[in-house]
């Protein structure tokens, strides 16, 4: 469990720094799981046919009869076998879940859904769980309050996790509690960073989505969405991996634990099961909890700001419409700013549809600029950095990992708007990286103001052998006495 870090940055939501949304791309987490070549199905059919012929011949030798009699006898045996299998299928119970599993499933599904728990930071050290309960009960029904304490001293760490019964109440808590004064301190409130999405690899590539779904739903409860990635060159086959979304973290972790067991197989394959990096959501940070702007895409050409204002003002007061120029001088997107966040939330409800001149618009909440640095597919405007997520146990009793955590080799670094100088943060404004040829033939890069002359390469230090080659005759040991005067200035090199 990691300690919370105080972050006193403030977000300027009126600053108009905008950037265009790119097409969202699924994170590539599967390079090591893709095979280079597929075995030819025809070879398998031939092999099976040859094996069947050998089996018939062996059977005929054992019976001592001719081949026609043997084939008739095999056909009769097959008919009997099919009848027996059909009878067995009819006798199977409708569900493989026993009473113990059914009770466990009910418990997992009774826990609050994903997105119903909030993180509260910046708490005074003398605040107890009852104080937090009194603070949050005014907002809505609480499922659980967990104040994080030091394991050794038992003192409060200054942050807590509060699980509400529903996601709507959790969102309301973020709006009301973030930046609120509580017992003399300004507290922070954002969604708790738990995971509810699994990546599953090494799936048989001939499986259909229905076959895969049946197996996954038998493993555990709470499956909400299954995305089995299809092979683009052959739609009858999959690429060997999938993403599964669960009702909450507890359901996801229950299934994960069962599937990583060495005895669990997918048609003989041992699956790879890890937490998937979630698709970004505008509600996942304290800064985003204050967003009052919409990102609107597919705006027809020559659409005026007055048309957009008239379209969206039915949800509340619109303070301004911003339509920045896009790439190549064309613009098909814009930002609608409301006076209240509640108006923006109403505007993005699933029941709302928008059209201009018969063309449907895409409307979502805008994102702060800081979040876009880690999500190149997002759409954003100026904002300051937000607190980092925290690793903590969830109310389901299972350990959770933070969103975007680098784990299992699946994390993919986000893009940055400018190069990073390791250990020094972002590159200073106005500077650029300039290539420079080093004496040993390698190419290095240095920071330099634009228009400045190329930086000179540092002089190459003579090698040890070169220093000894200055005098003729004698061994290197003898000649080294000539350089005793300089030995004191040389760095000691043990190897």
UniProtKB/Swiss-Prot annotation:
Residues 1-101, 452-495 are annotated as: Disordered. One of its GO terms (molecular function) is chromatin binding. Residues 1-10, 478-487 have a biased composition (Basic and acidic residues). PANTHER family: HETEROGENEOUS NUCLEAR RIBONUCLEOPROTEIN (PTHR21245). The gene is LIF2. Predominantly expressed in vascular and meristematic tissues. Expressed throughout development in seedlings, roots, leaves, floral buds and siliques. Disruption phenotype: Mild early flowering phenotype, reduced rosette diameter, abnormal floral developmental homeostasis and altered gynoecium growth determination associated with indeterminate ovaries growth. Production of ectopic inflorescences with severely affected flowers showing proliferation of ectopic stigmatic papillae and ovules in short-day conditions. Repression of FLC accompanied by an increase in histone H3 trimethylation on lysine 27 (H3K27me3). Altered expression of several genes, including LHP1-regulated genes. Interacts with LHP1 in the nucleus on a common set of chromatin regions. Residues 11-46, 67-101 have a biased composition (Acidic residues). It is found in: Nucleus; Cytoplasm; Microsome. It comes from the Eukaryota. Keywords: Activator, Cytoplasm, Developmental protein, Endoplasmic reticulum, Microsome, Nucleus, Plant defense, Repeat, RNA-binding, Stress response, Transcription, Transcription regulation. Residues 116-194, 196-278, 292-368 form the RRM domain. Induction: Slighty induced upon pathogen infection (e.g. P.syringae). Rapidly recruited to chromatin upon methyl jasmonate treatment (MeJA) to mediate transcriptional gene activation. Transcriptional activator that binds DNA on GAGA-like motif and 5'-(C/G)ACGTG(G/T)C(A/G)-3' consensus motif in the promoters of target genes. Component of ribonucleosomes, which are complexes of at least 20 other different heterogeneous nuclear ribonucleoproteins (hnRNP). hnRNP play an important role in processing of precursor mRNA in the nucleus. Required during flower development and for cell fate determination. One of its GO terms (biological process) is negative regulation of innate immune response. GO terms for cellular component: cytoplasm; endoplasmic reticulum; nucleus. This is Heterogeneous nuclear ribonucleoprotein Q.
